Curated annotation (Swiss-Prot):
The keyword Signal applies. Keywords: Signal. Pfam families: DUF1283. InterPro entries: DUF1283 (IPR009700). The lineage of its organism: Bacteria, Pseudomonadati, Pseudomonadota, Gammaproteobacteria, Enterobacterales. This is UPF0482 protein Ent638_1930. It comes from Enterobacter sp. (strain 638). Belongs to the UPF0482 family.
């Protein structure tokens, strides 16, 4: 019986010791920081973002012009195909690879 008591006391003592050492480890994190958002770092980040935006502006414009040019090209080809298919010329046919209206007999471009 005394061995059991010793073991229980030892286990209790170890548990209390463990709790005593772990309790001070937890830190208090209830610190509130309020900033206006206008710090030197945020101003520098904003300036860098603006500079990068301006540097890539030319590239964005080129990409947009290219996309618009491709769309215009497809639009003109679509209209030309419609005109070719609705043409009164029975020898006219639409060549999809070259996007042109051609004459079946000569292979030359036909104005629909």
């Amino acid at each position: 019986m005394t061995t059991l008591r010793k073991r229980l006391c030892l286990a209790t003592l170890l548990s209390l010791t463990a709790l005593a050492f772990t309790a001070p480890v937890s830190a208090q994190t209830s610190k509130l920081i309020i900033e206006s958002g206008d710090s030197a770092q945020s101003r520098q980040n904003a300036a860098m973002d603006k500079e990068q935006w301006n540097d890539t502006r030319n590239l964005r414009q080129k990409v947009n012009k290219r996309a618009e040019k491709e769309w215009d090209k497809e639009d003109v080809a679509f209209d030309s195909r419609d005109k070719c298919q609705q043409s009164a010329n029975v020898n006219a046919y639409w060549e999809a690879n070259t996007l042109r209206c051609l004459d079946r007999r000569t292979g030359r471009t036909v104005a629909p």
